[in-house]
Design a protein with these regions (language model features):
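Extended, hydrophobic/aromatic-rich amphipathic alpha-helical segments that build helical scaffolds
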Residues: 129, 194-209, 222-228, 323
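Conserved, compact domain cores that house catalytic/ligand-binding motifs in diverse enzymes
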Residues: 17-68, 72, 526-605
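Acidic/polar, glycine-enriched structural segments that form the non-catalytic walls/loops
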Residues: 1-54, 135, 140-145, 154-156, ...
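Extended glycan-interaction surfaces of carbohydrate-active proteins
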Residues: 9-58, 81-117, 159-189, 229-313, ...
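Non-catalytic C-terminal accessory modules of carbohydrate-active enzymes
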Residues: 285, 320, 324-569
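Extended, well-ordered alpha-helical scaffold segments
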Residues: 17-22, 74-88, 140-158, 204, ...
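A general alpha-helix detector
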Residues: 65, 203, 260-263, 320
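Aromatic-rich carbohydrate-recognition surfaces in CAZymes
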Residues: 53-167, 190-198, 312-334, 338, ...
């Protein structure tokens, strides 16, 4: 398996190895029950004298999330098998099972117990998983085989959308973001469920078109646009600057800052401006600790670092936030979260990832399982889909490769990227002002969009493909300059060389985790330009000094601004500690009298 699936070779050997462990873990979730068939269980733990061994039952939502990783590592046979398994236990009305006991064949599991179908999000997750598997593999035979079950799932979702806003509801469909805790009180529809359903809707038109179901295609297009509009408008809190948690049965909103909007951010479903606001809040320590993302902000009155849904750190949503940061071109906020999941590979049960951890200390909770598969999947998901930027589109014989490599990496090789029957290999090398890319393939021809990410403020960019000048149209974003290079891969090796002048990148901080530690690391909250100056916003502990490395043209500090009690004040809190060639190290000093975490913005020119 390891020799036929996606691997990376980067300057971070632990990251390369952690990906191999994650793929092994995702193979280990497969269980064959002689009475029920073969599918994915959620995790393993000790059973004691009378309990199940951790989450050793079949869990539909967990499995569907995990397929997002397996689609881009090439572990397709297991994905197709599990999607069929879940369809086998689909309820008559189309709802996909949340959990199936290993003893389900020996008791009245599906009728006498409330657990099999009590989650609403499992069905749109399964629909999304079918879509993503088809996009990666191009398996049209599977799509036609599963389509009757897919249509039943689609019709169930339509039956629980009752208020006309295009989004299915918790009140009619079941649980989604939370299972326990006051945070779920009075919820009519939460942003997590709304996001997963809207993501599923984005795949329905293409699949319906592929199987010739024109009626479903037309309905899905209209519903997709309606749902996305609701998601963007109903949940945005302009006063607070981030997306709310839920719409309430009372007609109001629950405006708590939670990790849940990341379910939409990871699919790029939110408009760019509001998404930036939410991503900045999620990047700060109130959600993103040194070791991962809390379910609920530490500033909430409901926050409890030991409570299941109200403050613990979950690796699976950590991956959601990491991928969301990459999706909106914010790699300096996404890397440390992915890196935390990487370090968990080696800090607890070797090669495994715990279910959840304390929101206050870097330690798993005693009552949770040490080997949870949707935690393991959230290393390859942000790594391959985010940092590497791989998006296969096998039905159209196409793919996108849009890497966002850390600014201090000089190379990266990616082996065995799969799109349908085509294997793609990529080697990327960088030095000051130059990126060189070698691309190769084996299998049927594909159209590849290679999207280079150049430092913010870059100028005079040129592209050569196989030694010949290649015209491209640069695309500016708030955080980088993108150069899309279109080419056909059909076996022969292709070389891309990109040159530019100027520009500046920030190196994401690395945080070496120690079991039991509290959260004290630096966060890059934002990096953009304003009035010709680069603007670097960081968050750290008062009284602490931090180092941040910049790579690109030499810069000087224009001014430094602190945010304190809602009022900004200018203060000399930053200095250039080192500068040579294209490297500038900043020393950032937060005032000693401010012992809480504070936001600091440095303007550079």
């Amino acid at each position: 398996m390891l020799a036929t699936t996606t691997s990376v070779d980067t300057p971070d050997d632990d990251l390369d190895l952690a990906l191999e462990w994650a793929k092994i873990n995702l193979e280990e979730q497969r269980v064959c029950n002689p009475d029920l068939g073969c599918g994915f269980v959620a995790g393993w733990g000790t059973s004691g004298t009378s309990f199940r061994p951790g989450f050793g039952w079949f869990f539909g939502g967990d499995a569907a999330m995990n397929t997002l990783a397996m689609d881009v590592t090439g572990q397709w046979d297991l994905v197709a098998e599990d999607l069929r398994f879940l369809a086998r236990y689909q309820r008559d009305d189309g709802k996909i099972p949340h959990e199936v006991s290993q003893a389900a064949a020996h008791l009245d599991w599906f009728e006498a117990f409330p657990y099999p179908y009590y989650h609403a999000d499992t069905t749109p997750w399964w629909m999304t998983a079918v879509w993503q598997y088809w996009k990666a593999s191009g398996d049209e035979d599977f799509l036609r085989e599963i389509w009757p079950a897919f249509i039943r799932a689609w019709e169930w979702c339509l039956s629980v959308e009752t208020d006309g806003d295009g989004i299915i509801e918790n009140t009619t469909g079941g649980l989604a973001a939370v299972e326990v805790g006051e945070i779920g009180a009075g919820v009519h529809q939460d942003v997590y469920l709304a996001s997963v359903w809207t993501a599923a809707l984005h795949g329905v038109p293409d699949m319906a078109r592929a199987v010739g179901d024109t009626a479903v295609e037309a309905r899905a297009v209209a519903l997709r646009d309606l749902a996305r509009g609701t998601l963007n408008e109903a949940y945005w809190s302009s006063d607070r600057g981030f997306h709310a948690f839920a719409l309430l049965r009372s007609g109001g909103t629950n405006d708590d800052l939670t990790v849940c909007p990341a379910a939409g951010l990871m699919f790029g479903l939110f408009d760019e401006g509001p998404a930036e606001g939410t991503l900045r809040h999620l990047a700060a320590d109130e959600v993103s600790t040194d070791w991962g993302a809390r379910m609920l902000s530490s500033s909430s009155d409901l926050y409890d670092p030991l409570q299941y849904n109200s403050g613990t750190v979950w690796p699976f949503v950590t991956g959601f936030v990491s991928l969301g940061q990459y999706r909106y071109r914010r790699p300096w906020s996404g890397l440390h979260l992915m890196d935390a999941v990487k370090q968990m590979t080696f800090d607890w049960s070797l090669g495994r990832h715990p279910e959840l951890l304390s929101g206050a200390f870097y330690t798993p909770l005693d009552e949770t399982v040490p080997h949870q598969f949707f935690a393991s999947s959230m290393l390859p998901t942000p790594l391959i889909r985010g940092l590497v930027g791989w998006e296969p589109d096998a039905p159209n014989a196409a793919a996108t490769l849009a890497p966002q490599i850390p600014a201090d990496w000089d190379r990266m090789a990616v082996r065995r990227l799969w799109v349908g029957d085509t294997r793609v290999e990529a080697v990327i090398e960088r030095e000051a002002g130059v990126t060189r890319v070698i691309l190769g393939s084996e299998g049927p021809p594909i159209e590849l969009a290679y999207v280079a990410s150049l430092p913010l403020g870059s100028r005079n960019a040129t592209v050569r493909v196989d030694g010949e000048a290649h015209a491209v149209e640069a695309e500016s974003s708030p955080h980088d300059l993108r150069l899309p290079v279109e080419l056909t891969l059909e076996g022969a090796e292709h070389r891309i060389e990109i040159e530019w002048t100027g520009g500046l990148s920030v190196v994401p901080p690395r945080i070496g985790l120690e079991p039991g530690q509290t959260s004290s690391g630096l966060r890059i909250v934002n990096f953009d330009r304003e009035d010709g100056a680069w603007r670097l916003s960081v968050e750290g502990e008062g009284g602490r000094s931090y180092r941040v490395r910049l790579i690109g043209q030499p810069v000087t500090i224009q001014k430094t601004v602190f945010s304190s009690e809602g009022a900004d004040r200018t203060s000399a809190g930053a200095r250039v500690a080192y500068q040579q060639d294209d490297v500038t190290d900043l020393e950032l000093r937060l005032p000693a009298e401010e012992t809480m975490r504070r936001l600091m913005t440095v303007y550079l020119e």
